[in-house]
């Protein structure tokens, strides 16, 4: 079974995302911030990371920058899911190693 780590400080977004991903057959783990997300990746590297940009403790861009230099950190597909919708943020995310960029809010 494919695994997805949701890294988002919003409990509501994590809940909605979990529902969508489980419906698609993913096993889901959650983290409330980037540091917690990196800790989860140390325990078990997921196949996919659904990542918010603005979070306390460690932002999404800090998370992906650190993830991509770790052993095995180049493997997960990383999808930013954020309210940041300007071209500069999208470019920065893709340059840091994101595979996709989705705008919030989203429907399921």
Stretches with model-predicted labels:
Residues 104:
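A Lys-centered signature of the CheY-like receiver
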Residues 62, 85-100:
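Alpha4 helix (beta4-alpha4-beta5 surface) of REC/receiver domains from two-component response regulators
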Residues 30-48:
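Acidic, metal-coordinating helix/loop segments flanking the phosphotransfer/catalytic sites
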Residues 87, 107-108:
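Conserved two-component signaling phosphotransfer/partner-docking surface
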Residues 32-36, 59-65:
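Acidic catalytic/metal-coordinating carboxylates
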């Amino acid at each position: 079974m494919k695994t997805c780590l949701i890294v988002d400080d919003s409990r509501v977004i994590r809940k909605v995302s979990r529902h969508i991903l489980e419906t698609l057959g993913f096993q889901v783990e959650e983290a409330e911030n980037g540091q917690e997300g990196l800790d989860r990746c140390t325990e078990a590297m997921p196949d996919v990371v659904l990542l918010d940009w603005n979070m306390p403790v460690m932002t999404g861009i800090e998370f992906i920058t650190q993830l991509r230099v770790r052993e095995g950190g180049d493997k997960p597909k990383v999808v930013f899911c954020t309210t940041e919708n300007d071209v500069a943020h999208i470019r920065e995310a893709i340059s840091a190693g994101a595979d996709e960029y989705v705008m919030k809010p989203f429907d399921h």
